[in-house]
Amino acid sequence: DGMVIDLEHLSNEAEQIKEKGISVTPDNLKLSKHATISMPWHKVQDELEENRLSATGSAFGSTRRGIAYAYSDKYRKKTLRLADLLHLDNENVKARLKTILDAKNLELAGCYHQEPMSYPALLSWCEKQADIFRDYICDTGIFLNNALADNKKVVLEAQLGAMRDIDYGIFPYTSSSSTIAAYGPLGAGIPYAPLNHIVGVLKAYSTCVGAGPFVAENAMSEEWQKLLRKYGGEYGAATGRP
């Protein structure tokens, strides 16, 4: 429920999995209707703002995948959720999409001098995503609660450490969501489910990518840093940065 989803990236991942002979169907992949959509302008904004900050030496080291901007628009209520894709023929949904785009075009034009995005093109993009994912969208909270009622085991997986948590991490050099275990049930739509086991995965040494303070980096020589990167494969999964 609490995720933001890059549907184009998800579609590409699903195709890669299928190419390896693994089926991807609504039976083994379910998307929460409450999840927030990463819209086409989110990556554009991320790229433009990171370039602007880089010019002054104050960039955050963003992956430029639009994550922060998707979460920002989620809390500003200026984006769509997956459930909206199921009702694109509804005039209220269309009107809301148009209103959101009008506001976003003002931001892009006023802050970054960009040409406005087209509403027909945006609606077409939404319709394409709806065609691909319609059968996968459901109330995952009900699905998981039913599984718990049947005494089935539910595993919640997340990434990033506590220091990247938006509330408890090294703000502002954090992710844009909560990374701690306690948020797991809430984000999954099962807020009252107890966490019976918490498993933390640690490496022998700490690493991080992006800008911001990192004590361990200052404690070792540049030669050691290069060795760890080389033999540990310490490069960002999304960007390839050291």
Predicted features along the sequence, with ranges:
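Non-transmembrane, aqueous-exposed alpha-helical and coiled segments at domain scale
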Residues: 1-242
